[in-house]
Amino acid sequence: MEYQKLNNNAYNIHFIKTTKFKKIRIKINFKEKVEREKIVYRNMLSLILLESCRKYKTKRLLDIECEELYNASIGSNTTITGNYQLLSFNSVFLNEKYTEVGMNEKTFQFFLNLIFDPLIIDNGFEETSFNNAKNYLLEDIESYEDSPMRLATSNLYHEMFEGTPIEYRVCGYKEDLEKITKENLYEYYKELIKNNHIDIFVVGEFDSNEMKKIIENNFKINTIKKPATSHIINHKTFRKVTNIVKSPKNINQSILLFGFKLNNITEFERLYTLAVYNSILGGSPDSKLFREVREKNSLCYSISSTYSGINSYEIISAGINKNDYNKAVKLIKKEIKKMTLGDFTDEEIKQAQITYIASLKEIEDAPSSMISIYEAHEYLGYDLMADREKNIVKVTRADIIALSKKLKLDTIYLLEGVKENDKGN
């Protein structure tokens, strides 16, 4: 695998060359600082731009053209990564090496048509596509109430990170969606195209000079952007007393969450030590939390831990019976304390490192995952795969103990089920 980055001031090109795949994957990211009210705008564009364009005015015509391009596929999504939000468009198509000369450029041109030449009527997006996208997004926003885990996590974020990008729901908010019109969405679209930072990632087997020429001949963006600031969110305030919150909900099972802020961690801790710590605590099937809380004491239906180096937090989540709340909290705190005291084995450290390396190996089998590695390198300064393999095995017991002391318990949140009986597990 060979990586090359090209910068022409208006956008960056990232070539990830490999002979493992017959298809080429192209991903285009539009990036800007997170603004809460703009989240729904970006979600709307994610939906509407792949529904039609000036050349292909219906979804049916788009589908026919995809078939003509040897079943090329297109997709889009939005994400929030720390201080920034990304609007991403993807295209996957068969390499012209296996079809006919010129198909790489032809498919790329089709892809760009969707992004840069939308179907605009009277200074606004076409009404049917606009309404379809708005209704779909409204359903997604309203579905938060139907997903206990999503709702509980969102409520925890509100308690811990109010007023910061971490708090914001990636789907956006109903009150912001209600303000969107066909016209103001188009105005925002034009601002996005002009002002967003843009990165183009290409994965597959191709000639770099030829692909560079294809991109530069067709990608007509020339606005020079100011350098972006850091994605990473570091916390400056920490609670002296843990915040305890309970919210009733008409569900059968209660959701228990522990939220920790990370205090002044190093880059090595962010990328490596935290991964090992989390795996041992609750991030693997044989973790301490699973063994002690779930298997030995039967105090939960499920339990795990996750972390975000970008957002500098660690979260423990468990599905419990509300009657076991006090016992579960006590036992979870006990396992956290064990990590601080170094009460874990060398074998647990080694297994966490092996699991980490195995996950890196799997990345090489998926073009989308390969892109994620280089996105993290570009946006966060994270190491590439070869360096990650070398560095993960450098994590020591002392490193894990030192990191554990930087986890500051901020909030214990319970989404309390009111349908539950008192039988326990």
Each language-model region and where it sits:
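Low-complexity, intrinsically disordered Gly/Pro/Thr-rich segments
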Residues: 396-404
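Short, low-order "capping/linker" segments at domain edges
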Residues: 139-143, 240-253, 357-367
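Acidic/histidine-enriched alpha-helical segments
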Residues: 63, 117-141, 227-237, 334-363
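Glycine-rich, mobile lid/loop segments that gate access to catalytic sites or pores
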Residues: 143-145, 160
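Active-site glycine-rich loop that binds ribose-phosphate moieties when present
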Residues: 179-186
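His/Glu-rich zincin catalytic helix
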Residues: 1-69, 173, 186-292, 411-425
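M16 family metallopeptidases and their MPP-like homologs
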Residues: 14-16, 22-34, 40-42, 60-113, ...
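Short, polar/flexible loop-turn hinges at active-site or ligand-entry regions and domain interfaces
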Residues: 52-55, 96-100, 117-126
